[in-house]
UniProtKB/Swiss-Prot annotation:
One of its GO terms (biological process) is vacuolar sequestering. It is found in: Vacuole membrane. Residues 2-422, 492-549, 604-641, 779-821 are cytoplasmic. The chain crosses the membrane at residues 423-443, 471-491, 550-570, 583-603, 642-662, 758-778. V-ATPase is a heteromultimeric enzyme composed of a peripheral catalytic V1 complex (components A to H) attached to an integral membrane V0 proton pore complex (components: a, c, c'', d and e). The keyword Cytoplasm does not apply. One of its GO terms (cellular component) is vacuolar proton-transporting V-type ATPase, V0 domain. Expressed in etiolated seedlings hypocotyls. InterPro entries: V-ATPase_116kDa_su (IPR002490), V-type_ATPase_116kDa_su_euka (IPR026028). Keywords: Acetylation, Coiled coil, Hydrogen ion transport, Ion transport, Membrane, Transmembrane, Transmembrane helix, Transport, Vacuole. This is V-type proton ATPase subunit a2. It is a multi-pass membrane protein.
Length: 821
């Protein structure tokens, strides 16, 4: 992208931000045998934006569809390896080997082998893990069900002894089921079967109820809770389960129970009622668990060794595959020659890059042992080229602020040149406090001094934005310190830094009164606001007047800059119509009204006059013939005002009427063959067309042009008033920032200091710090930033900036390694 070609080093000439780079449409004809290497070298150069010459074809119909599918399959394997390494906690190692030293065919074979091996290891490991989880559940069943059968056996033995002792022939309700055969007639004996297993605890009550209903109560079920969670063999997830034992009678009941167990996801395990066999099974299960644990551990070690091997080459393979895929995607944008022996490509490149592109084509032909070299030629076109600004790490953020509004049209004047200074300055006008500015500066210096380390780390969304705009914030903090010194505010506290105050108090009550009680005893305070103003009753009216007038002066100056930029645009594109019927009347209208107001403000400051400027400006329109009286600031002011008013009124039809008729006349002359000679000069014809707003089309809609000019005129006339008023936000936010800072200092810090209590002091200091950081350094910074952004986008840029271009996006490998699929 544009950001990667900054400064004046390397292949690029010195940076120029005012106009985008001159671009040219180039055509390259490349032999098939050197096409791959040619595109690779151009990707390393990163100065060609290829056009898709096969847009009518689907991706599957293109020449290199098979190669892209092959790269996609290798990329899938790479993603699989990355996922496996992430699960195992293995970090890919940074490699210093050159990716060009490896062959794609070798990589493909190696990836195939490694994937097959890893898949086999995972499958074996999953099978062993499933067996291990089943044995863990089986062991729990043996323990819990064994306890139940043992207690039942003990209870049966005790009851049998009691029956024999007391000679009681009746069956008890609690007679043990297992010993029933000893206490009943063998001819009347009923054989009971049983099933054991585990059921999820949240389903256990429903499971028991369904079993009871399905068998009409002809079952006996006993459940035991397992304290710790167990891993389910089927899902591989931890779950809380109960061990159950169900006794039933008959095969029909058994089939019902089996179906219900299957529906509830209950895992069943075999169990013997013989205590000796239970002990033998427990021993066997414990032994197998120990063996499986050892086997699983060995399998995981083997898997980790394999993943470590993959991690050593992972970054190298990943970068190689991404580059190859990007190369084939670009080759698919080139059209196949009718002979099918060469590829033809077209694309945009900066004019200065022609030599570097030709060198890359020559190197590719030599390195690929091609018998035929590539052909490079410049094409003539009327198509709008992309916009390319070479920026560095300092100017990139300012360019992004402008691009967020709209990318500059080809070779249109770039607002970023002045935004580098005006944006932080307007921010500082609203944020003027040199204490807060120092805090911002320290935070930004941390980001700047550690930028190499931080640029390689993944930061959060907010931190990423702050880091990306670190040089913008740096400039904002410097200007805030400057305006803070002018306002003489350090966390709202004034300091006589440059000299003592020019005033002294007439008496003791002077500080409680207005400035009438002050006597000027020394020279005027040399820089900024005299500290004596702070704390007096007239502080707010004085600062209000100062900042409001200052906001108007700044606003009118910046709007004039915008209109002057439109003059340089018109001059660059050789559009005399825009100079005489847009720039000139706009300058006259704005300065005859608000430029005149700015001059009155300066005269009032210099003379100390008590004239009411509101009255002067209002009655300049309402009663222009009335005498000014005490509001007169200079001789012949009435005549000057009448002249300015007349010029302002004349400038409105001057903007509206001539331009559509002149454009119509130019169109008619062009179609009579009077202007065809200019088409030989590609650059000029391109420039005229880009500035003409589409007036050179076959059909000239006069009504459409006239309505467009009418809207533009109305917008400028009304905008001159609303935009000037909009700059008063500088005054409002500056006042709000100052008052908030004063409130936090007086009502939090000083109030806490008034108590003779250390705890209250600490609380007061903490509240002051958090309020200052949270409200003034975060919220107020964001607020002032957004308002400065609005003033640039709306009030400044709409005077000259069209912003309807598109960004130069060259084919480059610079960002390939960081892209996500």
């Amino acid at each position: 992208m544009a950001e990667s070609h900054g400064g004046g080093g390397g292949c690029c000439p010195p940076m120029d931000l005012m106009r985008s780079e001159p671009m040219q449409l180039v055509q390259v004809i490349v032999p098939m045998e050197s096409a791959h290497l040619t595109v690779s070298y151009l990707g390393d150069l990163g100065l060609v934006q290829f056009k898709d010459l096969n847009s009518e074809k689907s991706p599957f119909q293109r020449t290199y569809a098979a190669q892209i599918k092959r790269c996609g399959e290798m990329a899938r394997k790479i993603r699989f390896f990355k996922e496996q390494m992430s699960k195992a906690g293995v970090t890919p190692k940074e490699t210093l080997d050159r990716e060009n030293d490896i062959d794609l065919d070798d990589v493909e074979v190696k990836l195939e082998e490694l994937e097959a091996e890893l898949v086999e290891i995972n499958a074996n490991n999953d099978k062993l893990q499933r067996s291990y989880n089943e044995l863990v559940e089986y062991k729990l069943v043996l323990e819990k069900a064994g306890e139940f059968f043992a207690s039942a056996h003990r209870s049966a033995t005790a009851q049998q002894s009691e029956i024999e002792t007391e000679q009681v022939g009746e069956d008890l309700l609690e007679a043990p089921l297992l010993q029933e055969e000893k206490s009943v007639d063998p001819t009347k004996q009923v054989k009971l079967g049983f099933l054991t297993g585990l059921v999820p605890r949240e389903k256990s009550m429903v499971f028991e109820r369904i079993l009871f209903r399905a068998t009409r109560g002809n079952i006996f079920i006993r459940q035991s809770v397992i304290e710790e969670s167990v891993v389910d063999p089927n899902s591989g997830e931890k779950a809380e389960k109960n061990v159950f034992v169900v006794f039933y009678s008959g095969e029909r009941a058994k089939s019902k129970i089996l179906k219900i167990c299957e529906a509830f996801g209950a895992n069943r395990y075999p169990f013997s009622e013989d205590l000796g066999k239970q002990a033998q099974m427990m021993t066997e299960v414990s032994g197998r668990l120990s063996e499986l644990k050892t086997t699983i551990g060995a399998g995981l070690d083997q898997r980790n060794i394999l993943l470590e091997t993959i991690g050593d080459k992972f970054e190298q393979w990943n970068l190689k595959i991404r580059k190859e895929k990007a190369i084939y995607h670009t080759l698919n944008m080139l059209s196949l020659d009718v002979t099918k022996k060469c590829l033809v490509g077209e694309g945009w490149s900066p004019v200065f890059a022609a030599t570097e592109i030709q060198d890359a084509l020559h190197r590719a032909a030599v390195d690929s042992n091609s018998q035929v070299g590539s052909i490079f030629q410049v094409l003539r076109t009327k198509e709008m080229p992309p916009t390319f600004f070479r920026t560095n790490k300092f100017t990139t953020a300012f360019q992004e602020i402008v691009d967020a509004y709209g990318v500059a049209k080809y070779q249109e004047a770039n607002p970023s040149v002045f935004t580098i200074v005006t944006f932080p300055f307007l921010f500082a006008v609203m944020f003027g406090d040199w204490g807060h500015g120092i805090c911002l500066l320290l935070a930004t210096m941390y980001l700047i001094l550690r930028e190499k380390k931080l640029s390689s780390q993944k930061l959060g969304d907010i931190m990423e934005m702050a880091f990306g705009g670190r040089y913008v914030i740096f400039m904002m903090s410097l200007f805030s310190i400057y305006t803070g010194l002018i306002y003489n505010e350090f966390f709202s506290i004034p300091y006589p830094l440059f000299a003592s105050s020019a005033y002294d108090c007439r008496d003791v009550s002077c500080s409680e009164a207005t400035t009438i009680g002050l006597i000027k005893t020394r020279d005027t305070y040399p820089f900024g606001v005299d500290p004596v103003w702070h704390g007096t009753r007239s502080e707010l009216p004085f600062l209000n007047s100062l900042k409001m007038k200052m906001s108007i002066l700044i606003g009118v100056a910046q709007m004039n800059l915008g209109i002057i930029m439109s003059f340089f645009n018109a001059k660059f594109f050789k559009s005399a119509v825009n100079i005489w019927f847009q720039f000139v009347p706009q300058m006259i209208f704005l300065n005859c009204l608000f430029g005149y107001l700015s001059v009155l403000i300066i005269i009032k400051w210099c003379t100390g006059s008590q004239a009411d400027l509101y009255h002067v400006m209002i009655y300049m329109f309402l009663s222009p013939m009335d005498d000014l009286g005490e509001n007169q600031l200079f001789p012949n002011q009435k005549i000057v005002q009448l002249t300015f008013l007349f010029l302002a009124l004349v400038s409105v039809p001057w903007m509206l009427l001539p331009k559509p008729f002149i454009l119509k006349k130019q169109h008619e002359a062009r179609h009579q063959g009077l202007s065809y000679a200019q088409l030989d000069e590609t650059d000029e014809s391109l420039q005229v067309e880009t500035n003409g707003g589409g007036h050179g089309h076959e059909e000239f809609e006069f009504s459409e042009i006239f309505v467009h000019q009418l809207i533009h005129t109305i917008e400028f006339v009304l905008g001159a008033v609303s935009n000037t008023a909009s700059y008063l936000r500088l005054w409002a936010l500056s006042l709000a920032h100052s008052e908030l800072s004063s409130v936090f200092y007086e009502k939090v810090l000083l109030m806490a200091w008034g108590f003779n209590n250390v705890f209250i002091w600490i609380v007061g200091i903490l509240v002051f710090i958090f309020a200052t950081v949270g409200v003034l350094l975060v919220m107020e910074t964001l607020s002032a930033f957004l308002h400065a952004l609005r003033l640039h986008w709306v009030e400044y840029q709409n005077k000259f900036y069209e912003g309807d271009g598109y960004k130069f996006a060259p084919f480059t490998f610079t960002l390939v390694g960081n892209e996500d699929e």
